[in-house]
Amino acid sequence: MTTNEQKKRIYLSSPHMSAEGYEKAFIEEAFATNWIAPLGPNVDSFERELAERVGVKAAVALSSGTAAIHLALKAVGVGQGDIVFCQDLTFSATANPIRYQGAIPVFIDSDHTWNMCPKTLKKAFEKYEAMGQKPKAVIVVHLYGLSADLDAIMEICREYDVPLIEDAAESLGSLYKGKQTGTFGDLGVFSFNGNKIITTSGGGMLVSNDEEKIKKARYWATQAREPVRYYEHKDLGFNYRMSNICAGIGRGQLRVLDERIAKKKYIFDYYKEHLSDLEGLEMMPIQDYDDPNCWLSCIILSTDRVKPTDIIEALEAENIESRPIWKPMHLQPYYQNCDFITLQEQGSVSEDIFNRGLCLPSDTKMTDEDLAKVTMVIRGLWG
């Protein structure tokens, strides 16, 4: 066994089950009642409880956040050849469903918030309007739990009468001006992947105050099966429903969401207190309107003395997980031929954040001793 393997692993953001065993209780109930297949009482309850928590009229539990984005695009009418404006600085799961629908993504650069720049979004609308074209939808992301500048973005979408989809996969519990992100646009998306602030092992949720859109999404997610005795399908459907077992995990996790948010914020504040004095190191930006869940605590460097890769390698040598900021979509080989809109004459804001940024371990099971170890390793690079 190597020295590194002997050291306790400190994770970026791993699943964290409740100490009370809420998840296990819901799963055991599902086994006891033989509700093992997709759909069931846990699914119904999880949808209702999540909708109540975030403050929307309707929600549908799905197999992933990616599935939720796909059905959101379908629900607003995105189809073959349509244009969709999409935040550039994000994970590929935000953009890929655009291609599932045969649509064309146009990537929008970020600003100081790390999220979609409203001025760049406006520039994109003006460019395509001059060509006689208009996007069918806009997808904004609340990156790492940081709220986008929603008022400005929504105003532009209303001006051009284009639906707004919020990718809130990383921002459950983040508040924009006191209200949950993911509930401002026409549709919102949450993710319960294993590394998210709460998990269902794998899963997602599509939410909206438009109950008809959620009803339609539920229909598509269940293979578009018609409500008749025999199997009849008038539309193309998908196998996107969440299992009753996974929903049971989600119900248990929802009961400790506030605890998880509090710990994520504690981790962010710890790093801020113990690292902010280092020359050329800044914490990710939090705006006055924002109350983020701090899903991942990120930093950005403005020094030639230490590179993000130096920190990643130094932490990994101590068996501590960290990772780079998401690689922007316009730099991805698959999307290299897609249009990219930026206000910069050279380079882009998203590329700069990618080059200089870093996600620090933000696992809610971390102890103060773990946090002290992380900060000690990082501080050591400054000498």
List PLM regions with ranges.
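Conserved PLP-binding active-site segment in aminotransferase class I/II-type PLP enzymes
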Residues: 1-75, 79, 140, 158, ...
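Hydrophobic/aromatic ligand-binding patch that stacks against planar heteroaromatic rings
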Residues: 96-98, 156, 197, 245
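Active-site phosphate-binding strand-loop segment of PLP-dependent enzymes
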Residues: 113-200, 205-207, 212, 307
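Conserved PLP-anchoring active-site segment centered on the Schiff-base-forming lysine
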Residues: 70-124
